[in-house]
Amino acid sequence: LECHDQQSSQTPTTTGCSGGETNCYKKRWRDHRGYRTERGCGCPSVKNGIEINCCTTDRCNN
């Protein structure tokens, strides 16, 4: 599986996920600088106030 892994509004980059990982994620939250976005492999659990979207196809988390 190939997932996007750039932070917030940086130029898109991708990474190959290891260990048979089948999910990509896009996590979004707000801090004093505005909205922040994190992308990567997996589907981590998140705290309240953090929005997360998980998906299962190549580059689906941009």
Swiss-Prot record:
Iron-sulfur found in the keyword field: no
Tissue occurrence: Expressed by the venom gland.
Pfam families, per the entry = Toxin_cobra-type
- Cellular compartment(s): Secreted
Task: List, alphabetically, the InterPro entries matched.
Answer: Snake_3FTx (IPR003571), Snake_toxin-like_sf (IPR045860), Snake_toxin_con_site (IPR018354), Toxin_cobra-type (IPR054131)
**Magnesium as UniProt keyword:** no
Q: List the disulfide bonds.
A: 3-24, 17-41, 43-54, 55-60
Q: Where is the composition biased (Polar residues)?
A: 1-16
One Gene Ontology MF term: toxin activity
Q: What CDD domains does the record point to?
A: TFP_snake_toxin
**GO CC annotations?**
extracellular region
Q: Which UniProt keywords apply?
A: Acetylcholine receptor inhibiting toxin, Disulfide bond, Ion channel impairing toxin, Neurotoxin, Postsynaptic neurotoxin, Secreted, Toxin
* Sequence segments annotated as region (Disordered): 1-22
Q: What does this protein do?
A: Binds to muscle nicotinic acetylcholine receptor (nAChR) and inhibit acetylcholine from binding to the receptor, thereby impairing neuromuscular transmission.
Membership in a protein family: Belongs to the three-finger toxin family. Short-chain subfamily. Type I alpha-neurotoxin sub-subfamily.
Name of the protein in its database record: Neurotoxin 3
